[in-house]
Amino acid sequence: LLMTVPHLKDKVKGMLYMTRYGDTTDIIRHGLTKIRDGSEAIINAPKFAQLLNVILLFGNYLNATGIKGGAYGFRISSINKLVDTKAADGTTLLHFVERTVTRCFPELEGFVDELSAATEACRVQLLDLKHDLSELKSANVHHKKILDRLHSENEENVEAPYSKLMLPFLNKATNELHRLTDQIQYTERVFNEAMRYYGEGPDPVRRSFTG
């Protein structure tokens, strides 16, 4: 009996799209919020900025006689190298920085709290959110075209249960996807602003705090 339903395959795909749509848009929306909050957190993190200055001083001291001495800054990703510089007893530069901050700059220890939102943002990839949104927009256009074709084939299809269910949903989704597109563009601007604030130029490949 089901096989006699016109355009059954297209209708089933449309229903599946509708059931998955809400979860996907929620993931995108929550992910964008985390990235925006994380970007704003690292811009408004004075203790973290001061900590970077301390690390820069250490780096310049260690490289005082080399070509890297007297640097005005360093890439954020270079912080990972603090564990690679070791003394004879195995103590890393990270250990030394930690002890120095605790002893001489205890007021900077709260930088971790400043970056709590950025920690959440590390779990989100902006490129993944953009990809998910692009797939939703393509699917929405596809199912709208199918619905238009059904209506052109037979005017009675306009009043069919599938059309009455899908048409309002697709129209609403179209507007919502436009808003999500605007939100992604705004989030990307905020993210790039945070990268530039720390001297990290916008990178089309790097769209997360872990990059």
Language-model features: locations:
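Extended alpha-helical domain cores of large, multidomain eukaryotic proteins
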Residues: 1-211
